[in-house]
Amino acid sequence: MTDRGRSDATAIFAAAAVGLAGIALAITLAIAFGAFDDSSSNPTAQLGDVPGTTPNSDRAVADASADPAEIVRAAAEAMRAVTSVEFELQRTGAPVFIDQFEAIALDELHGQFTVPSKAQAELTVRINDNLNTRLGAVAIDTEVWISNPVTGNFETLPTGYDLDPSKFFDPENGWRPLLTEMRNVELVGIDDRGGERYHVRGIAPAAQVREITVGLVRDQDVPIELWIHPATSLVTAAELTTVIDAAESNWALALSNYGDSFTIKPPENVTN
């Protein structure tokens, strides 16, 4: 079995909720299935750079002479203190499978996460390379529900699955060590992505890449592009290219609505 075949739907969910995702994360979900209500989200708090969109400007101004090492250091501390976040992942290139049978490939992911261990998301996937569909998922503490693509009902995953949505923001294993241990950090420039952002590039060590992707990407240092908000020092977007079975897969992650209150509760339509 290949490395990509060792992960499962639970793992990709954890990656996004954390984000890169979720990279990703546990990596977005049950909006289409009505499993939760996010009426408390504040659109004016949007700081993320959603792939393929041009968000409204927040008028942030970045210092072109800023020290890239200091930018990343401040980002590490800011990400350490995150209590909630909305995330969106888009993936292109070689397929990344989320099941052990290598039948379900992840294309997109969108959801929310709150500490210490609540997440919900919607995954856009391709089944057997010819059927596009969406899967919902909800994780609360140690319990995880995944939607059935045929019935739309949620099913409780059996015990034994490794899902820790808080891992992405764990100060020991999540964003903070990834940022503090990046090598060859450079400030590429100042980009307008709904306001000015620091565009930083560096090399993420293999151990941290594996952590934030919950095992989807293994045994490789990865060049990573980050966009960091100059006022909050929060990461608003990340892009990277990984190699799985000698084929490239491209990941684009957007993080937004930090600190918002999200309603995450068990789905009502659960079958055993």
Where are these regions (language model features)?
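N-terminal leader/targeting segments and the immediate start of mature chains
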Residues: 2-4, 8-118, 262-272
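Extended lipid/amphipathic-ligand handling interfaces
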Residues: 71-77, 108-117, 136-141, 224-230, ...
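Short, hydrophobic/aromatic-rich segments at coil-to-beta transitions
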Residues: 81-88, 116-124, 194-201, 233-238
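Flexible, membrane-facing loop/turn or short amphipathic-helix motifs
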Residues: 93-102, 129-130, 208-217, 246
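An acidic-aromatic
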Residues: 108-174
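Short, solvent-exposed aromatic-acidic interface loops
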Residues: 123-132, 151-152, 238-247, 269-272
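Solvent-exposed helix/loop surface patches that form functional interfaces
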Residues: 159-195
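Gly/Pro-enriched, hydrophobic low-complexity segments
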Residues: 198-270
